[in-house]
Amino acid sequence: FKKFIDSDDHIKRADYLAWERKYWDLKRMLKYLPTDQRALYNARQILMSNSYGVDNAIAKVPQYLKKDPGLEFDRLRWRNRRGRLESSLEILYKNANKTERQMIRPDLWWEQRKSVARTLIYKKRYKTAYKISSEHSLSSGPSFAEAETTGADNKTP
């Protein structure tokens, strides 16, 4: 298959596997990626699988790839699972004005955004929860309806 599949195809497959959270398959195909992309997807794989060396893996990602929406998402999810609310908010604020297309998978971003918003509501930080809920970048579908409803529920009088 080497003559039919080029590095762009491998990058697309790696991106698909990463967004689908198939980190074991992603890990097995890292060797087919160009060096810079290998560093990016290795960091994503480590974040997804809760492996050791997260900081080291992220440090190896080239600067121009550190703003990759997938890496940002995996970092958000990793921080959110560990209860790091303020650093989760930092990532959400940094990605607040991106379009649905720039987010790649805004539906998955919404799940993390919703989780952070609920934590904020629990902590009685209603205005911040509303801000986080309303900046969802969705335009249609069930997640859009939920995001719009959640944002409306968080409005303070």
Cite the ranges covered by each PLM segment.
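Alpha-helical solenoid repeat scaffolds
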Residues: 1-157
